[in-house]
């Protein structure tokens, strides 16, 4: 072994905040379907707790043996609208409570899959699940919800988009004692992926295996430190440096994924290449963009820098791992990135620029606080804009937005932990009410017809 490479790895972990953001076990609940809701919930609880009983323990073992921090251990399950749809119940809140209880028993950080896939229309189960989201997120701690409202092959379900604006508002209202924290556990997608290890949008797709291990890496600090060594050099060198660094980060992710897979006797699924920031200084995607040459993220050139970063991360990552998937790109969550927070506060970064940035990276308008009195129709229109970007560009986009109750532009909303602090951002106050209320479907784009 090369001593320099060992020292480099130690430095990346200790000084540059390299870590494994999550080991996520995906679990199929299709065999838990039952027309009796009580029986279905018992099956769900038993299946999750039995399947993932050693997940936290194995994560800690790998962490101590290899010296690699593993920040979160998580579980994702089959979208609950599919499982609960067989019952005659008119609310799925009890299913959310069962998931929360299972998460507590396991000692995991989050459990994703209180989800519905409605890109082309809603079943009875989808409608009940969506209407259950506000209460479910208000009374549970670890359950995350997601709704897929569009895809490139089907277009955008504008009825669901309209409804999700109302659901987000109601979720914020029911969790107003925590500044609308319930909305931080709710994602609205276009082109959602089935193997996403990251919360709050993770669910276990119906095309996945019985159980699977997916890993999400994180290393913005490592990329920034590498770029500090090539200051003033051309974009060719910058791209190559990012690529080589992403290769190293992903190699570590694959090592952990394979080791977890072997010890848990669960197949290895994918490594998600996403650069996921934290609120800690030096662990920021915004700081990478500024290192590339921007005085402050949000100024002209931001989108080009982000596009290059995203592409170089993918190119480096795919060479390092046999199975890459999930969202795989650079995350730009405002509240979780110290550089983004600073840019919003000083006026360099606004909502319109963030929308532009989502065209070239993963995933979308993420962890953004807006005034609490924002109309539901405006939130629906924001979802529609992001869904359109995803559907037309054949990529995953999403909205995780918090209309913070009682807060106005310039206020700070504290979520704590990895979710950080969100400055309340200004929105366009012109009405989108008539637009949001039209309903129906926006047809799939012409270039979606590939057959």
Curated annotation (Swiss-Prot):
Gene3D superfamilies: 3.20.70.20. It comes from the Bacteria. Coiled coil: none annotated. Pfam families: DUF711. InterPro entries: UPF0210. Belongs to the UPF0210 family. Homodimer. This is UPF0210 protein CLH_1879. It comes from Clostridium botulinum (strain Alaska E43 / Type E3).
């Amino acid at each position: 072994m090369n001593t320099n490479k060992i020292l480099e790895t130690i430095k990346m972990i200790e000084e540059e905040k390299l870590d494994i953001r999550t080991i996520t076990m995906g679990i199929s609940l299709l065999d838990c379907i039952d027309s009796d809701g009580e029986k279905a919930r018992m099956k769900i609880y038993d299946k999750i707790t039995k399947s993932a009983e050693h997940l936290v323990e194995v994560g800690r073992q790998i962490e101590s043996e290899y010296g690699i921090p593993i920040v979160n251990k998580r579980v994702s399950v089959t979208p609950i609208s599919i499982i609960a749809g067989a019952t005659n119940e008119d609310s799925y809140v009890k299913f959310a409570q069962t998931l929360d209880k299972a998460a507590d028993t396991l000692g995991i950080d989050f459990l994703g899959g209180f989800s519905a896939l409605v890109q082309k229309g809603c079943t009875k189960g989808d409608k009940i699940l969506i209407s259950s989201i506000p209460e479910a997120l208000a009374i549970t701690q670890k359950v995350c919800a997601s709704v897929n409202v569009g895809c490139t092959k089907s277009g955008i379900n504008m009825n669901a988009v309209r409804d999700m604006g109302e659901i987000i508002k109601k979720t914020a209202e029911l969790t107003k004692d925590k500044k609308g924290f319930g909305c931080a556990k709710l994602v609205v997608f276009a082109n959602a992926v089935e193997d996403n290890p990251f919360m709050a949008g993770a669910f276990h797709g119906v095309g996945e295996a019985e159980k699977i291990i997916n890993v999400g890496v994180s290393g913005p600090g490592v990329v920034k430190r590498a770029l500090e060594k090539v200051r003033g050099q051309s974009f060719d060198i910058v791209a190559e440096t990012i690529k080589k660094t992403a290769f190293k980060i992903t190699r570590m992710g694959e090592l952990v994924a394979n080791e977890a897979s072997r010890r848990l006797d669960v197949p290895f699924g994918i490594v998600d290449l996403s650069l996921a920031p934290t609120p800690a200084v030096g662990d920021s995607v915004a700081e990478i963009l500024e290192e590339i040459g921007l005085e402050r993220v949000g100024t002209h050139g931001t989108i080009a820098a982000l596009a290059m970063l995203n592409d170089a991360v993918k190119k480096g990552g795919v060479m390092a791992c046999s199975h890459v998937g999930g969202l795989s790109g650079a995350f730009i969550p405002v509240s979780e990135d110290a550089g983004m927070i600073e840019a919003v506060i000083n006026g360099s970064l606004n909502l319109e620029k963030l929308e532009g940035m989502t065209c070239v990276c993963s995933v979308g308008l993420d962890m953004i606080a807006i005034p609490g009195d924002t109309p539901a129709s405006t939130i629906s229109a924001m979802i529609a804009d992001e869904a359109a970007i995803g559907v037309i560009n054949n990529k995953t986009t999403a909205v995780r937005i918090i209309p913070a109750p009682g807060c106005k532009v310039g206020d700070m909303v504290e979520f704590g932990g990895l979710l950080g602090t969100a400055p309340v951002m200004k929105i366009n106050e012109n009405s989108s009410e008539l637009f949001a209320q039209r309903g129906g479907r926006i047809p799939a784009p012409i270039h979606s017809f590939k057959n």
